[in-house]
Amino acid sequence: MVTIVDTLSNTPLRPRHPEKANRPDSISPAKPSWIRVKAPTTRGYADTRNIVRENGLVTVCEEAGCPNIGECWDKKHATFMIMGDTCTRACAFCNVKTGLPAALDAGEPEHVAEATFKLGLAHVVVTSVDRDDLADGGAAHIAATIRAIRATCPTTTIEVLTPDFLRKDGALEQVVAAKPDVFNHNLETVPSRYLSVRPGARYFHSIRLLQRVKEIDPTIFTKSGIMVGLGEQRHEVLQVMDDLRSAEVDFLTIGQYLQPTKKHHAVMAYVTPEEFSNYETVAYTKGFLMVSASPLTRSSHHAGEDFAKLKAARDALAR
């Protein structure tokens, strides 16, 4: 379980989630056997961690407490989280720090590009915190990062996982103009759970955001994901699939929600591997080019391999 308070040399710092500090604990059921993963101990993991530290970068792998960090970092795969480590939203599921972020680091795009080169990444995933404090939500910074990676690693394919740019006119267009290979924006949960899980966002705004990407540039792959185990019903998950297909989204990910701390939203259910397999089958019948659904599926897990499959699926349709 990840601590709610950041520490440095045993000295307590500010609460990681001050808005949650006084909430009563939410108790989740014990994790089933299919959820458990091994602690990261490999040389590849250590090498990736060193490259991240040397370039002064933040990864969502660490900040969000991803269960797949050992596997991904062993393969020198990492998802870079730009625009700082502090988010202006306070979603009930997320372990990223909340509060007032620091100013943007103008050198960050080049640092990310350099780390991408050092890791030898064929496919890189770049995500970010929400930056509601910025006029464009950080869109120009995301676009600059895409361009920096292109300049340094011209053969590397680029996937961005973006905020919703709520009430940020023109922001989405800046990111799309930089031409990422994959534009990912997660819905996170079904509409009925938004007020308790993702109160700062709007479900249909997120659907429209994904739809707009395809309208601006149909060649960009679009991707979205949800977590299950937050109290949703099966029919609601199927409706999300239909909504995403109506926006021409290509790739769907579905994973199990895991509670970061007892101050976060409780796990309401652990969805079985068989249920995930069924969701995957149904999603393919609805027309998604690529579907990843399993207890440990996360947005950037196996992103490189999945991009190759996604491209092959579209090429097959074109023939």
Swiss-Prot record:
Cofactor note: Binds 2 [4Fe-4S] clusters per subunit. One cluster is coordinated with 3 cysteines and an exchangeable S-adenosyl-L-methionine.
GO MF: 4 iron, 4 sulfur cluster binding; lipoate synthase activity; metal ion binding
Organism (species): Bradyrhizobium sp. (strain BTAi1 / ATCC BAA-1182)
Annotated segments matching region Disordered: 1-32
Coiled coil: none
Taxonomic placement: Bacteria, Pseudomonadati, Pseudomonadota, Alphaproteobacteria, Hyphomicrobiales
Annotated Polar residues bias: 1-12
The reaction(s) this protein catalyses: [[Fe-S] cluster scaffold protein carrying a second [4Fe-4S](2+) cluster] + N(6)-octanoyl-L-lysyl-[protein] + 2 oxidized [2Fe-2S]-[ferredoxin] + 2 S-adenosyl-L-methionine + 4 H(+) = [[Fe-S] cluster scaffold protein] + N(6)-[(R)-dihydrolipoyl]-L-lysyl-[protein] + 4 Fe(3+) + 2 hydrogen sulfide + 2 5'-deoxyadenosine + 2 L-methionine + 2 reduced [2Fe-2S]-[ferredoxin]
NCBIfam families in alphabetical order: lipA, PRK05481.1, PRK12928.1
Protein's recorded name: Lipoyl synthase
